[in-house]
Amino acid sequence: MTFGRGRRHVGRTLVFAVHVFGLSVSASARAVDESGTDVQALLDENIVTTASKSLETGTAAPATSTSITAEDLRRYGIHSLDEAINFLSLGVVTANPLRDPDIGSRGVLVTGDHGNHILLLINGHAVNEPLYGSAQFGRGMGVPLEMIDHLEVVIGPGSVLYGSSAMFGVINVITKRAKDFAGTHVIAETEVGKSYRVAGGAGYQFGHETELTLAIGYYAQKGPSFTFGPQNFGVDDVSGAPIVTTYKGPATGIWSGTAHNSYYSYVPEAVLRFSSGNLEVNLRGATYKRSAPYAAYLSPVPGDFDYPDNYDLDRSASADIAYRVRPTAVLDLAARVYGDTFDTQRIYTVSASSNCIYRGNTSPCLYHWTGTSQWVGTELQGSFNWLQDSSLVTLVGADVRVVSVQAKQDVQNADTLAYHESSTNVIPIGNDKVEEVLGAYLQQTWTPAPFIALNAGARIDASERYDPVISPRFAANLAAWRGGTIKLIYAEAFRAPSWNEAQSSNVNLLTAESLRPERVRSVEAVLEQKLGAQRVLFGVFRSWWTDLIDLHRLTTQEYIDLAAQEKLPSLLSFSAQQYRNITSIDNFGFNARFEGSFLGNKAHYALNATSAFTSRVDDEYGASHPPAVTPQMFGNARIAYEFGERYPVIGLAAHFVGKRPAARTFEKYVPQIAHFDPYRFAKFPYVEPQLELRLTVSGPVPVVPGLSYRASLDYAFSDEAPYIVGRPVDNHNVRTSPTAQFAPVDRFRGTVGLQYDFLP
Amino acid sequence: MLVGAATSSLLARRAAAESIAVPIRLQAELLAKMASYDRNFQARTGERVRTLLLTKLGDPESARAGAEMKTALASIPSIGGLPHDEELASYADAAALADICRARKVSILYVAPGFSQQVDTMREAVSELSLLTVGSLADYVPNGIVLGFDLVSGRSKLLVNLTQARRQQIDFRAEVLKLTRVYE
């Protein structure tokens, strides 16, 4: 297979982007004469803090970033972080397997990674937990939307100041200050027939220096129902009869039907932000229970079809206390202590005998994975503003963290809940239950002249689980001409192996040995041009990813070698896998953005586009191939018009993703048997492009002061998501279906909501 | 060392509530643009714009903001189309401030952080002068500083005290007033 078509598509879209750039500059040049547009242009500058841990404009920041305002979230009917990313951000995209969204950036996405290649911050507090490295980017994020002041989406490697997981970039969710959330607020919203959400919040100032904002919310979703075509799982190895695919159901071997009960989620969430003088306290807590009607990633035997008690449950809470002070005009000091707790459960009932091999038992088995992690840490930071005018600033910091992780798997009789055996897959292995992680960073910024700014820094991260990792970044920002800025950026980032990857084991998984951190290097050149109230960004990038951790299927020779070394576990299947550093990715492409306002600042628009050519080399497929699920062309467009303070705002947003291979497309299923066609699919399954449109109307309810509404309609043109339902081969590796069935898409959605503000 | 410094700083008197929310460089650019939308600016200023950057003695936040604003304004070719000079000054009292503004023909007064308690008296002292007062903090504007900057949802916002603007003979054009949050 060749991928020349991909290179041509990058070329065509590059030509289109350059054309749009030219048109926009021309249009902007005309707009510059309008009175007030020069002031408007400055007011439209994003103010960011994430890229360099200092207050600066987006143009001056040493990275490409998008700032998404609370106003944008409301105007365009956004309900969750993944929707904000898809409809409003540049360079980042999510895909929805009906469970937790996968997230990727600039043409790279790792399916089923629990979001561990992008760092999620809430008010600067890192949320990714150590067991899986996971963070939630959908409804499970745990912050009521009305509490969000703005989102900063920084793309490209960001470990220089933040350490592990910032490979795709960093997303910082900034919550509102009391002045912007003044009073008490009550919100009720429903996606008609599918979900509802209620939330309340308040923001109060006490005197000149003290303030409190808090919000709580509850989201519940059930449905819609999806119908799945027949998936033939074949004959059960144990019973000799067709596999049972429904709870205590008949032995048909066929997994199919309409799932009415197994697609739901429930999210209670609460956040609090308190500040008094130099002290700031952030607290957050959320639980996220969800069930998906199918397994997005391959299981040898399916969970019982439409069984409502198969679910995942995450619970998380965090506390972050920060104190900042400026003892002299040169020095800023900040100290922060933080603590997090996270636990997860996965409950999974299976009636197939081959997954429930316990003598004398005929009841279904209940698989119960549990994992917990807690971590506490402190970060100390000093900023030296040597000339007191921010032209020469040294930032130095250290972050020390202690991590504790535990996990296990139990198998129970689903009827009596009696345990079938001792816990397996126990993490941590051995007695070393605590990990100490040290991160230290240094960043130097220098503005030798008003038209040039330089930023160089590096962070070192060390832990007993891996060799020290250094993540440097160099950036130059050149104000090349009036309104024009050129940025040149080189950055590296890493991801530490999660505890799950490093230590988990079961009958199908051999414990990993000596996993190294994943690495990425990236170079980027970005041109930003402001002309009047319009802004254009065009950037090209290239990145190299090495040592990515993936599952390697053991070969026959490896089984023989393990046996010879007496390392072969007593219970290990003949299709067992092992986490290894086996995958590399090479990619290049461009990001383009065109945004601004017109009609006296009443109309706002933006167009974001990303195109990439990505080549992945992995253990399974061997030769280079595009990464699964990841669109190589994606973007969004939006326009909104404000009719006036007492009238509605109408917003139309569109999200586009190009054709892409489905998850598991390039996996083999029996690589150790030479005469079998090793791929699961007779033809590689590609999902057609998707276009999603959302129309939103919002504004104050006439006659009732304090009451406002928001209503949106959402339509997706394609009914296919890039995930495979079931399996195209049966339990005996016989191909039963020539084509793949793609996961469904909830194509039409309507949402209405009301908010009442009790103003002080 | 950092731990010790952080601990000792617990006694520091500066409050984060008076921290800058909008980058100084952007404040300087907005100030320069806004000046050109004041109909009386050229008449008041003459041939050269003189900006006084007022800082509070012994206040590190204030000192740094003043120094940074001086550098930022110096890099801007013109303010309201005119050449310009900037000068740092420490606040003594309101009467002395008014005298300095008169004596040095100051046309823009930039008030660095640290003056939340003095803004009222400052307002009374300069009310009779034809002078654009600019606050580094949003809190200053409702209390009598003509122009200020706030951060709302990751974007800067201009604040204008229109009553005080009229008193100080500042006449912003409607094109920019509609972009601001107006206090009357």
Label each PLM-derived region with a short phrase.
Chain B
Residues 2-184:
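Short hydrophobic alpha-helices and adjacent helix-cap/hinge residues
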